[in-house]
UniProtKB/Swiss-Prot annotation:
GO CC annotations on file: nucleolus
UniProt biased composition (Basic and acidic residues): 809-870
Chain's gene name: DBP10
Stated name of the protein: ATP-dependent RNA helicase DBP10
Disordered: annotated span: 332-354, 517-536, 601-666, 726-758, 787-878
Record text about domains: The Q motif is unique to and characteristic of the DEAD box family of RNA helicases and controls ATP binding and hydrolysis.
Biased composition (Polar residues): 521-531, 606-620
Protein source organism: Phaeosphaeria nodorum (strain SN15 / ATCC MYA-4574 / FGSC 10173) (Glume blotch fungus)
GO biological process, one term: rRNA processing
Residue interval(s) of motif DEAD box: 229-232
Length: 878
């Protein structure tokens, strides 16, 4: 028999020969085997098997059909079918509308299915909820008859928990898994009842879940799968003690997952303590600035910063002054509705229309946000603002106005904007350069892939300018320079006039400057290498030239004027004030300056000589491109391991570049054709991040991976600036000893606290005895974990959805003065009248409305009285 033909390498579909064997329609058709099948059809003998040729032909036809399918590209990516999910779950995923997994799902789902602990960094809207819900349903599969919850999902807020519950129900549509919701604000008795129905999945907030655990004495030894969703928000909201207590009660064999938008230091420490050999999932593409984002850097003076902002909005972004068209249309429709006019047909919803000039301005502190929003409103721009401790309702209203197009500008702090999904597809403007490259990538590149064309504008101060050289995917060829003074002066004068006329604006500016000084003292400082690069950059004459974006607008006369002003600004007199007019005299001050000048000249000569020797020997100062990993002395320096300007394959990057000036004696030993750098190219890191097989090879060491991904943001208000230098202990007069200041912050000061199983302090009110009273009143017996489920408990299951209650309101009976509780009952009746309950709904007064019969009867009585009393009156005698 002839040897078997090799299987087609490009095949992804299994071949079904049932129709051919059963004599179907396709079997009756003659076979047409073409010469170019893409496979090996040489069987070695003339009497080869017809079945093998038939299978090969059908397989080749299937390959051609898949290759020629419309909308398919040559590069094939694995879908949900390649992850080994069950049929019911795949059907639910298809009904949900998911076809291709997102990058975070492509990397996280296989690792979670393997049983590894995972720390995933993903922004809101990246599909992270499905990334941990799909493996959870695949692992739990069906409802277990044994008592005990097997999956727990922790959410920071009630709204996010409800959203997660909806996703779990949609993906678990084909299973009988029981899911309950435990959040604050709901009835404890109803949640007691839900916990006795043996749920498989618990979606809860940490505070309420810990309350039920302590109150009911829950045994969590059956938990196999726990997820901390939005883990950074959990720590920010003060749930660290609750999470530690919950984690201590879980078995060691559990699988723990953390998903977060950022990775603060506290979260890294929690992951190291609570997770076993975790794998960090972080796509390098999310730490890059989008190639669709055009960047421009402007050097400005501190005093001209606000004027430069007005100038950029007016002349670069071309933002009009006044209310938006969407706002005018919405106001017109509101006026028409108030006048009783109908809405015009086909006008559409004006709140759905985007604004072309949508701009986002990032600031450091909330005081700066308040000042900028007030300044821009005074300049005539519609502005929304968001900062950290803004009320949730006010924050939603501000963001809603910006998304609806009622405002053109959103002023926001870095803390409030973290993980926030921007709905705009137009440029965003950034007022200040952040303190780290990670923060800049998070703020500037968060929604880059969704932009048709973006514009990032960063006014740069000299001490922070070198940070941009360390950015991945942003070469140093990005243009930089100062603004044209003749265009900047009117905007600066406008800001000065506003400050002169508005006293409140001056007060806001003073508070903002004080807060910014506090921010400068508490933020992370730049490394020594960054300081050296900043000094080298500041000494470059091109750094102070007019930006190339404004060169076309400058005429020859204006350019000559600017050049003259630049020369005047850079003028250095040959003599100091101590030497003027004192030549030839024996002045002590002049003699000191002459000696000082000799020492300075000697030092300059030595530096120039050393620099010339370094260039002649091919040695230069270590920069971001040639610095070894062990010499990178800050978190910004550690990110330089992914190449900078050496990546030549990034052809899709959209930047406004300027030609480099060739410096003699620098990098002359490096050949573009033969030189091989030890640094990995940029596309290598991108392909490694998106890879499915072997994608976790670089994340085997969580400590080193988390060190590069860690990002702790400085608070945006003054109260949080001094936390780093705040004393950790205080003297307690009552106990006569030093105690931790955490006692003042966790609620234990002046309140009763108890120690949990993990040693953490929890509120004593968690153990109030309400569950024991409820259990006795309802005669419910709690089953132990591991026992078989009682058959009568399944009928009482509630998934945490709405429960229907009667809404009957009964008013109390009238008070009886002969009873002992007369005064108490009278008070209840009075309260019912005030609240209009029951038959007091229309008020407690007597109903004075008369019916027709009563009115008719009263009229007849009045007529009879008139007839009877119609006799003339007696005359009075005086």
């Amino acid at each position: 028999m002839a040897p078997r033909a090799s299987s087609p390498a490009l095949s992804e579909n299994e071949f079904d020969i049932f129709d051919a064997l059963a004599g179907g329609d396709e079997a009756a058709q003659p076979m047409r085997v073409t010469a170019d099948l893409g496979i090996d059809l040489e069987f070695g003998s003339d009497d080869g098997s017809d079945d093998e040729a038939f299978i090969a032909a059908k397989q080749a036809a299937a390959n051609r059909k898949n290759a020629n399918a419309p909308g398919k590209s040559g590069k094939k990516g694995g879908g949900f079918q390649a992850m080994g999910l069950n049929v019911a779950l795949l059907k639910a995923i298809a009904q949900k509308g998911f076809k291709i997994p997102t990058p975070i799902q492509r990397k996280a789902v296989p690792l979670i299915l393997q049983g590894d602990d995972v720390v995933g960094m993903a922004r809101t809207g990246s599909g992270k909820t499905a990334a941990f819900v799909i493996p959870m349903i695949e692992r739990l599969k069906t409802h277990s008859a044994k008592v005990g919850a097997r999956g727990v999902i922790m959410s920071p807020s009630r709204e996010l928990a409800l959203q997660t519950l909806k996703v779990v129900k949609e993906f678990g549509r084909g299973t009988d898994l029981r899911t309950i919701l435990l959040v604050g604000g709901d009835s404890l008795e109803e949640q007691f009842n839900s916990m006795t129905t043996n749920p498989d999945i618990i979606i809860a907030t940490p505070g309420r879940f810990l309350h039920l655990k302590v109150e009911m004495g829950l045994d969590l030894s059956s938990v196999q799968y726990i997820v901390f969703d939005e883990a950074d928000r959990l720590f920010e909201m003060g749930f660290a003690a609750q999470l530690a207590e919950i984690l201590y009660a879980l078995p060691t064999s559990r699988q723990t997952l953390l998903f977060s938008a950022t990775l603060p230091k506290s979260l890294v420490e929690f992951a190291r303590a609570g997770l076993q050999e975790p794998k960090l999932i972080r796509l390098d593409a999310e730490s890059k600035i989008s190639p669709d984002l055009k960047s421009a850097y402007f050097t400005i003076k501190s005093g001209d910063r606000d004027g430069a902002l007005i100038h950029l909005l007016e002349n670069v972004i071309k933002m009009p002054v006044g209310q938006t068209e969407v706002w005018k249309q919405a106001k017109e429709e509101a006026d028409n509705l108030s006048k009783g006019k109908k809405r015009k047909r086909g006008s559409g919803n004006p709140k759905d229309a985007p604004v072309e000039e949508s701009t986002i301005i990032f600031a450091a502190t909330k005081h700066r946000v308040e000042y900028l929003s007030t300044l821009l409103k005074a300049a005539g721009y519609p502005v929304s603002y968001v900062y950290g401790n803004l009320d949730q309702t006010a924050r939603q209203e501000q963001v809603k106005d910006f998304r609806a197009g009622l405002t053109r500008i959103l002023v926001v702090t870095d803390v409030a904007a973290r993980g926030y999904r921007h709905a705009t597809h137009k440029p965003r403007h950034q007022l200040r350069l952040p303190f780290s490259t990670k923060n800049l990538c998070s703020s500037s590149g968060e929604d880059g892939p969704r932009w048709a064309e973006g514009l990032g504008i960063q006014p740069v101060q000299t001490c922070r300018s070198a940070i941009s050289h360390r950015l991945t995917n942003v070469p140093w060829q990005t243009p930089s320079g100062c603004l044209a003074p003749y265009q900047l002066e009117p905007s600066v004068e406008l800001v000065n006039k506003q400050l002169t006329d508005d006293e409140d604006l001056v007060n806001l500016l003073n508070v903002a400057e004080k807060g910014e000084r506090q921010y400068q003292r508490t933020r992370n400082q730049a490394s020594n290498q960054s300081v050296h690069r900043a000094k080298d950059l500041a000494s470059d004459s091109k750094f102070a030239e007019t930006h190339m974006l404004f060169n076309d607008e400058m005429h020859d006369a204006l350019r000559a004027k600017e050049d003259m002003l630049e020369r005047i600004q850079g003028f250095r007199p040959a003599e100091t004030v101590f030497e003027i007019g004192k030549r030839g005299t024996n002045s002590e001050a002049a003699e000191i300056m002459r000696k000082r000048r000799v020492a300075v000249e000697r030092q300059k000569t030595k530096q120039a000589f050393n620099k010339a020797n370094d260039e002649s020997s091919g040695l230069t100062r270590p920069t971001a491109d040639a610095l070894p990993d062990d010499e990178l002395d800050s978190e910004d320096d550690q990110q330089a391991a992914v190449g900078d300007y050496e990546s030549e394959s990034d052809e899709l990057e959209v930047t406004v570049s300027q030609p480099e000036s060739k410096k003699s004696g620098k990098d002359v030993w490096r050949s573009d054709e033969f030189f091989m750098s030890y640094l990995p190219k940029e596309n290598f890191a991108e392909e490694k991040a998106y890879g499915v097989q072997g994608g976790d090879a670089g994340n085997s060491n969580f400590v080193s991976a988390a060190r590069s991904a860690e990002m702790s943001l400085v608070n945006d208000e003054i109260q949080g600036f001094a936390d780093a230098s705040k004393p950790r202990m205080r003297w307690d007069k009552k106990s006569k000893k030093y105690v931790s200041r955490a006692n003042d912050e966790d609620g234990s000061k002046g309140a009763k606290m108890i120690r949990g199983e993990s040693g953490q302090k929890i509120a004593a009110s968690f153990r109030s005895g309400r569950f024991d009273d409820w259990r006795k009143a309802n005669k419910v017996k709690m089953q132990r974990v591991g026992e078989m489920e009682a058959p009568n408990r399944s009928t009482q299951f509630n998934s945490g959805g709405p429960r229907y209650k009667h809404k009957a309101e009964k008013a109390p009976k009238q008070a009886d003065r002969y009873r002992d509780d007369y005064h108490v009952q009278k008070q209840r009746v009075q309260e019912a009248k005030e609240k209009r309950i029951g038959h007091f709904k229309d008020g407690g007064a007597k109903n004075e409305l008369k019916d027709v019969d009563t009115v008719r009867k009263e009229r007849r009585v009045q007529e009879k009285r008139k007839e009877k009393n119609a006799r003339p009156s007696k005359k009075r005698k005086f």
